[in-house]
Regions:
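Active-site substrate-binding loop specific to GH73 endo-beta-N-acetylglucosaminidase modules
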Residues: 1-137, 147-184
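Axial heme c-ligation environment in periplasmic c-type cytochrome domains
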Residues: 138-142
């Protein structure tokens, strides 16, 4: 948690970006313009969530922040160093969030436990895990071995009850038997 925070404050944006890119396997464009986060000193009565919502509310920001913020807000129960908390600035924390998956389904969650339960069952997360595992072991993206390789591996991973050993075997078979130069 502390790696995705400032030294004295949480960063739902950094936490949300990490989750969306590395856990859920989605891509984000860089911001259209540079900005500096609002200092907590400028709005001492606002929680981090309220400050982030204020700063990222313009429509041009919402293109990405509508995806990012909800994921990060679900982790607001953890302070800058990862300690659990239920209040910030004498206010009860709001750790509810939303996420729209690749298929356009909106998922709502309240807090880190519900977020974790969603991720465990998420097709986006399963696909991202398979993709990262393939790239780790083979040093190439799955698409280099065929347009449907990632789908095949993700379906096999699911069929094998998310058995990582079986996934590694499937990856090894594909890497050993398919020529990336002949991919579809």
């Amino acid at each position: 948690m502390s790696g995705m925070s400032y030294h004295d404050a949480t960063s739902p944006i950094h936490r949300g970006v990490f989750l969306i890119r590395f856990i859920l396997g989605r891509t984000l464009r860089p911001p259209n313009e540079a900005f500096s986060p609002l200092s907590p000193d400028l709005h001492p009565d606002l929680t981090t969530r309220e400050r982030v919502t204020l700063q990222s509310s313009p429509d041009n920001c919402q293109v990405c922040h509508s995806k990012i913020n909800g994921l990060g807000f679900a982790l607001e129960n953890f302070d800058a160093v990862g300690r659990f908390r239920s209040q910030e600035r004498a206010k009860t924390l709001d750790s509810t969030g939303k996420y729209v998956d690749r298929d356009g389904n909106e998922v709502s969650f309240s807090g880190p436990r519900e977020l974790a339960e969603y991720i465990i069952s998420s097709d986006d997360a399963h696909r991202a895990f398979v993709n990262r595992a393939f790239q780790h072991f083979v040093k190439h993206p799955p698409a280099a071995f065929g347009l449907h390789t990632l789908d095949e591996l993700t379906n096999a991973f699911r069929k094998n009850n998310f058995n990582i050993n079986e996934l590694i075997v499937e990856i090894a078979i594909i890497a050993a038997t398919r020529d990336p130069s002949l991919s579809e």
